[in-house]
Amino acid sequence: MLTAFARAFRTPDLRKKLLFTLGIIVVYRVGTHIPIPGVNYKAVQTCVSEASGNQGLFGLVNMFSGGALLQITVFALGIMPYITASIILQLLTVVIPRLEALKKEGQAGTAKITQYTRYLTVALAILQGTGLVATARSGALFSGCTVASSIVPDQAIFTTITMVICMTAGTAVVMWLGELITDRGIGNGMSILMFISIAATFPSALWAIKKQGTLAGGWIEFGSVIAVGLVMVALVVFVEQAQRRVPVQYAKRMIGRRSYGGTSTYIPLKVNQAGVIPVIFASSLLYIPALVAQFAGGNSGWKEWITQNLTKGDHPIYIVSYFLLIVFFAFFYVAISFNPEEVADNMKKYGGFIPGIRAGRPTAEYLSYVLNRITWPGSLYLGLIALVPTMALVGFGASNNFPFGGTSILIIVGVGLETVKQIESQLQQRNYEGFLR
């Protein structure tokens, strides 16, 4: 990995791209500390220090914003609206024929879907910004903080609208920065910003665990977190690289006087075909009842049950629900993102076949069978990766705000591997260009 970056810095074109990407990252991190008008930041700092290590319902969104959410800054929403919009459009592509047709139109269709994603991102940013401001005004953003109600001292409508506009504009700027990295830098822009956002929360989260620890001044908890985190990174790297290669052969065809085909290749089916999406889906779904209960009035029985069972990450009901939702969404997302019938039809169209399997419907059935078999261990792996941090700290009685959580590790390792692959492919391409000259 370090060798690839060193070689990239020795190549002028890649060095410019890497420096441009680093410059955008600096701009993004500066934006996460720019305050918005109408917020009492002394009260915010007091509540953040009191809530350190226990971010509650907003922990996931705060992680994706690089800690900017609980600071209520311009980039408070981070890239979460874009992630949500991308997932929604990906799901709608399967349901709405018009979007499915656009997806098959190539570059023009992809550009149109990207435009829809931008519009939906802005709409979601307005909704999420309004919800965040309303939560901060009511004092529910930092429940239990003594000065939570004074975070937004001015309750005027104009102040609320100004705050929402600032956060929505910040989301649009983040989206633009991500697209700049994609076009002129290295790697996928949104993935890089996601990587940076998560990595930025690691030092404070680790230090919070050390401060809250009780064994040897917190150093035992601190060391155990580092050890478990390294083991998880190694496991994630191993599984993310694992794939089942389905062999494919292409028959020879004579077109004019030339012979085409006759080659052998394979279809790479990853063990974790769904990626990190099931974990995000499951986390978001579990936040909904807890969020409703937090804003609901009165002391009804259902509200008390949700508060006790679905807001604490170490509660058995929460753990079981989280695990089952991850397994379900892993199968669900694989089913909508990989179409065996479409793959089988494309293979048949170009004269490809799987040895021992007839072309057409039998090929589609075989691919579905293989995919279901490898999705089972993939879904169980996702569930375990998401729950291991919580289970590791239950014995120590430390905070469940584990910095090496399943979502963060999956994203960091996935983005890191993909970025290194892209750098190596560009280095290889430039080597070939030098050879051809």
Predicted regions and their residues:
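N-terminal cationic and glycine-rich segments that engage phosphates or anionic surfaces
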Residues: 1-103, 108-437
